[in-house]
Structure formats: C-alpha cells, structure tokens
C-alpha cells in the first residue's frame, strides 16, 4: 500500500524555487475520434469483413506505474508537471498516516 500526501513542497520550474504543490493522480484522457490512426482503423473496419487488427490478449503486467500530477499552488503560476513513481497494487492519496505503537481497529 502506497500512501501519498495531498500536498508536497517541491521545486517549481516556473517559480524557480520550492513551493507547495497539490498532488493528484494522473488519468489518461479520452481518445480522440479524429486521430490519424483511429480514422484509418475505422475506415478499414467499415463495410464487409470482420476484425481487421489483432486483439491483444497476452497481458503481462498486473499493475500500472503510478504517475502523480503536481500543480503549483502559487496563484499566478499554477504550472503542472508529472512525476512517475514505482509500480504498486494499492495506491492511496491523502490517507491516514501510520502511527507507531497504535492499536489496530477494524
């Protein structure tokens, strides 16, 4: 389980100094219907004849690499950058911190 705080003080390239950054998890945007590859694929698929490209079925990985999106909280900066961290099965953003000697409650 990887637990990352929602804010982090780190270097901002635009400000040129360490600033607090808001941390969110990167998510892939929706694929465009008008990208060249998609247009070519749709054209090829139209009409008679079935699936024209192989459907990938040999998945190798069980996890994805976590990518953090850091946004500077300075009002007139707001620059964003990505930061990749290692693979993990469970990722948590801003969860409770572990305390030493605490009793585990269910």
Curated annotation (Swiss-Prot):
Matching Pfam families: Ribosomal_L44
Alphabetized SUPFAM superfamilies for the sequence: Zn-binding ribosomal proteins
Segments for region (Disordered): 34-53
GO CC terms, sorted: cytoplasm; ribonucleoprotein complex; ribosome
Main location: cytoplasm
GO molecular function: structural constituent of ribosome
InterPro entries according to UniProt: Ribosomal_eL44, Ribosomal_LSU_eL42, Ribosomal_zn-bd
GO-annotated biological processes: translation
UniProt superkingdom: Eukaryota
Protein location: Cytoplasm
Modified residues (N6-methyllysine): 53
UniProt keyword list: Cytoplasm, Methylation, Ribonucleoprotein, Ribosomal protein
Protein name: Large ribosomal subunit protein eL42
Native organism: Pongo abelii
Organism ancestry: Eukaryota, Metazoa, Chordata, Craniata, Vertebrata
């Amino acid at each position: 389980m990887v637990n990352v705080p929602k804010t982090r003080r780190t270097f901002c390239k635009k400000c040129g100094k360490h600033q607090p950054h808001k941390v969110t998890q990167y998510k892939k945007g929706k694929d465009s219907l008008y990208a060249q590859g998609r247009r070519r694929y749709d054209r090829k698929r139209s009409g008679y004849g079935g699936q024209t490209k192989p459907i990938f079925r040999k998945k190798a990985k069980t996890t994805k690499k976590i990518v953090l999106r850091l946004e500077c909280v300075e009002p007139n900066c707001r620059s964003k950058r990505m930061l990749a961290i290692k693979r993990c099965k469970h990722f948590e953003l801003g969860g409770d911190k572990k305390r030493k000697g605490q009793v585990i409650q269910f």
